[in-house]
């Protein structure tokens, strides 16, 4: 049970709620949080962090600060693939957003020489940095350190 607490992502989930609220303010629209969007077969669904069918917007939130592991890169790539699948299945182009909470993450996703960064450019995914409080940053970093201890 102690390990479950150590690997908890409660702080990141809290940060995602705050970031979601800020995204609505930045975009100036009401978004649906974590909707289940069913695909063609009505059995399979995706569940982005935010969505607006009316405004053709879909997005994901990455509440991580600093270097991330390969698994987290795969998570980002998976999130992007889901957004691209939505375009294909719905036969319409959505504005795709990926929200981060640090300049470092924004810069890495937009400007690195990785295939992931190039995919973001080629598929016109907008990386938006949402400012969060220093206190929340510290909570996220503390959680990441705690998770690192249990996951290594």
Could you tell me what each predicted segment is?
Residues 110-152:
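Non-catalytic C-terminal interaction segments of nucleic acid-processing enzymes
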Residues 48-60:
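Active-site beta-strand-loop-beta-strand hairpin of nuclease catalytic cores
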Residues 38-43, 104-108:
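Acidic-and-aromatic substrate-binding clefts and catalytic sites of carbohydrate-active enzymes
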Residues 62-120:
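Catalytic cores of nucleic-acid endonucleases
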Residues 38-39, 65, 132-136:
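Residue-level detector of flexible, active-site-proximal loop/helix-junction positions
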Residues 43-46, 81:
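Alpha-helical scaffolding within the catalytic cores
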Residues 1-38:
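Acidic-basic catalytic patches of nuclease active cores, encompassing PD-(D/E)XK
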